[in-house]
Amino acid sequence: MPAPSASRPAGSLRRLFSPLLSLLLVLALGFGLGGCVTTGLASSADSPWQPVPLATTANPLAVAFTDDRHGFLVGSNRLILETDDGGASWEERALDLPEEENFRLISIAFSGQEGWIAGQPGLLLRSTDGGQNWSRLFLDTKLPGEPYLITALGRSSAELATNVGAVYQTRDGGNSWQARVEDAAGAVRELRRSVDGRYVSVSGLGNFFSTWEPGQPTWQVHQRMSSQRLQTMGFQPDGALWMLARGAQLRFNPDAADPEQWGKAIIPITNGYGYLDMAWDPRGTIWTGGGSGTLLSSSDGGRTWQRDPVGEQQPTNFTRIVFAADGKGFVLGERGSLLRWVG
């Protein structure tokens, strides 16, 4: 009778443990994948944000105030709302525009009682009485691109940037405009202006960014820092840049004079949603927001982050975070979502 094979016990052990190992592998994969769709961050004990109900399903895109209490909120589908209590409540307004045109009001700015609204397609409005009345300024048909960002600069003065990076300035209430850049930057997905007049833009495909400052004849092109396409860029309070990229990555530029210098990528949370904007509140806390109610804050320069308990309850994508010089703050979201800073 042949001796029993020495390999049989080992084979029996393999058959015994194989289902167990498979189960452990499935569980490990489950937990690993679950980490991509759960928060992984602690939620703050309280929130400085208060939801503000809006009687609209349009997307708020920009907000500006004439004084401490009176202001306007504009957005898609000709949305314009007015507040007289600092943004705690809003009432719908109407603009005298052709009904067949579904304008997207994308930018608004005030300098005292003089206001400007930029919209698409081809819309520019001006008010001299705090927004009670608006007059339309007809733009040159040869204007490169569509109006994208309007900045009020003082009495009868404003600066208009388009979605291809053309920059124009008026000093006579919009009757004439002077080009500030010789060549446009090309199609952009995002464009921001600093308080001292510098611009940063992200290319339409997110594969590079460009900068421009007063006195330069053309935009300066810069390559992105990683394989991840760029989403949004803007300016930190000290004038240096910040960057949001696909894959929920964010970076900070440590030197405002060198847009090629960047810190390491920071990924606060991997919940499957990217970030769409970033801003600094009056206390210096950094806020970033994005898809599916993602609203995070960091009080240590981006090293650690917390989820905001009010933000995560909102069924929306946060697209813009705005803090005014006087301390007012708002988070704008899709489908009529708005949060107001209450400190």
Give the positions of each predicted feature.
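Bacterial N-terminal signal peptides
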Residues: 19-34
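Residue-level hotspots at or immediately adjacent to binding/recognition sites across diverse folds
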Residues: 34-343
